[in-house]
Amino acid sequence: MSTIFANIKYLLAPSLILVTLAGVIAGGMLSWIGVALLGVGVIVDTILRKQSSSSMHKEDGTTKASPTFQNLVMYMMLPVFVLLQLALAWRVYGFMTGVPVEITATWFGLIPVYSGITSLDLIGAVLSTGIFAGIGIIYGHELSHCKGFAFIISRMTMGLSGSAHFCYAHVYNHHLELASEDDPATAPRGRTIYGHYLLSYLGQSKFVFNMEKERLSRMGVSFISWQNRWIRGYLMAVPTVALFFMAGGWIGMAVLATVWGISNFELEALNYLEHYGLIRVKDQPIDYRHNWDNSTCFTAWFFIEIGRQADHHDRGETHFWELE
């Protein structure tokens, strides 16, 4: 039984993402379900202070979680997030073309499905999508520590939020320069979370820009090249941009900008909370004291153990279900 629980507890986020997707498709008041779920999550996490015991381990020290199952779930989140964006773009298109707001079907004889969407419910759909697209970034983060196929999935997942640069910046900058002035993802004391949002995003992008500039120069290759991973990362976002522009023109672009803004804010808010104000003398070893940890049950299960930052930075190659 404990082995089953060690695996299914991490299905909390995927389950709520699917509920949010269903809400955007159904329309009406259900378009706001992602916003409602966020509110419920904050309340539950505030009240439920019980500490999570990670995935628990067998007597031989191995984790009870199944690597195959957990990896499959992470890989499957990419098409789910693509569907979430498609559903929102479809809602934008219906709004822009004046599709009448009528009940055209019911699910399970109880849940109405609307053909069109009102401006108020479209706002709900945009906010809900942005909130749970941010959860996609969590899976992109986990897979960025892998190689090969998993890393490609990570880049594509982050590309859906216009942040494919993160995969390289996180591994080659944040994990090496943690809590120092050279790490844009570490917020120094006195910086607001809103200021950190922009400075961290742009700083990480600048790191990959410079990294590729130096790498390609050593290779004798032009910066404007298909071999430029900084450029390729942003090109991954082109299909998403094209989708929303075709769906609603500049309104579609505003919708996408809002979704990207929310999802990336969630990422940088996590960076802010995990390392705010911590200082490490450059070239000194990274220690557990250079991270703020949180292992309450809801945070651990919903954010797939991202709160176990100390162990994550100590053993960066370790999968989330193995962290202590």
Where on the chain are the PLM-derived regions?
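Juxtamembrane membrane-interface segments at transmembrane alpha-helix termini
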Residues: 43-55, 137-138, 164-167, 266-275
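Intramembrane catalytic core of multi-pass membrane enzymes that act on lipidic substrates
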Residues: 62-201
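Alpha-helical bilayer-embedded segments of polytopic membrane proteins, i.e.
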Residues: 2-49, 65-91, 104-132, 226-268
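Generic signal for short, ordered secondary-structure residues
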Residues: 58, 122, 152-153, 249, ...
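Cytosolic/stromal cytosol-facing helical appendages immediately following the last transmembrane segment
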Residues: 2-16, 20, 148-228, 262-324
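Short alpha-helical catalytic segment bearing the HExxH-like zincin motif
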Residues: 134-139, 256, 301, 305, ...
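Membrane-helix interface linkers and caps
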Residues: 48-62, 99-100
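Alpha-helical transmembrane segments with an aromatic anchor "belt"
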Residues: 58-68, 284-288
